[in-house]
Amino acid sequence: MKFDRHRRLRSSATMRDMVRENHVRKEDLIYPIFVVEKDDVKKEIKSLPGVYQISLNLLESELKEAYDLGIRAIMFFGVPNSKDDIGTGAYIHDGVIQQATRIAKKMYDDLLIVADTCLCEYTDHGHCGVIDDHTHDVDNDKSLPLLVKTAISQVEAGADIIAPSNMMDGFVAEIRRGLDEAGYYNIPIMSYGVKYASSFFGPFRDAADSAPSFGDRKTYQMDPANRLEALRELESDLKEGCDMMIVKPALSYLDIVRDVKNHTNVPVVAYNVSGEYSMTKAAAQNGWIDEERVVMEQMVSMKRAGADMIITYFAKDICRYLDK
């Protein structure tokens, strides 16, 4: 009987390494950090074991640890002392993210700062824009100028990449126009243009204190049941000028990661979100899985699906695994 002998290329660790199609590198990773304005806080987030809210005055040690491990891209999320109905803290000169960015760039000029450009962490209602008094929904067009102000403020503080996550229609076009008019032609936009209204975001909202005080985000984030809608969002953001595209969440949406990769030549970013992280951590802490092997398999699955970069709370752990 004649048959194919595929096992020839699996015969040893060296052989398997030689023919491996996808690899996870430190350069692929973007590490999220939650920064609070209050002094002397390093508080572990209960629903995100091993992830902390960190004060501005303690940020340097966290940045040094990440940098020394080989991480070269950071994404800051701010937890401000005060909030209002229009998210003023997102775009003021001395906002928590602006301060964190200046600290990071002063320490390491080659550390890329990816700015999460949204209002939900700064609004007292927890939504990603201005609320219409009549519909009690987010007013898309009134929110856009505030997002532009936020992006410009973040770049002025030293951000290298703008990553708008609010899912307002036209947000990429307006931010691109605003950045260009301000002279920031070379600042790329990493759009969260394929962002689903996912239940996997729960622990993040604990970490960033950004849960909506009423309703949900289903009128602006995507329905998890939809696949073709992702391609429509992608097409719009590409026309509007995005330079990179985020798919969020990642692990339950690997088909979407592959679809996006197949329909664009811009880099694709997978966001390994908080709920995905927490499930893995919980199973590992109970001894049900081998954390290192499962984490690396998850990362490889995202790369195999088409991700060029991965935003993950496991970034420091992955660097340690790769150093072994």
Swiss-Prot record:
Binding sites annotated in the UniProt record for Mg(2+): 233
Entry EC number(s): 4.2.1.24
One Pfam family named in its UniProt record: ALAD
PROSITE patterns to which the protein is assigned, alphabetical: D_ALA_DEHYDRATASE
Family: Belongs to the ALAD family.
Biological function: Catalyzes an early step in the biosynthesis of tetrapyrroles. Binds two molecules of 5-aminolevulinate per subunit, each at a distinct site, and catalyzes their condensation to form porphobilinogen.
Subunit description: Homooctamer.
Protein name as it appears in the record: Delta-aminolevulinic acid dehydratase
Taxon lineage: Bacteria, Bacillati, Bacillota, Bacilli, Bacillales
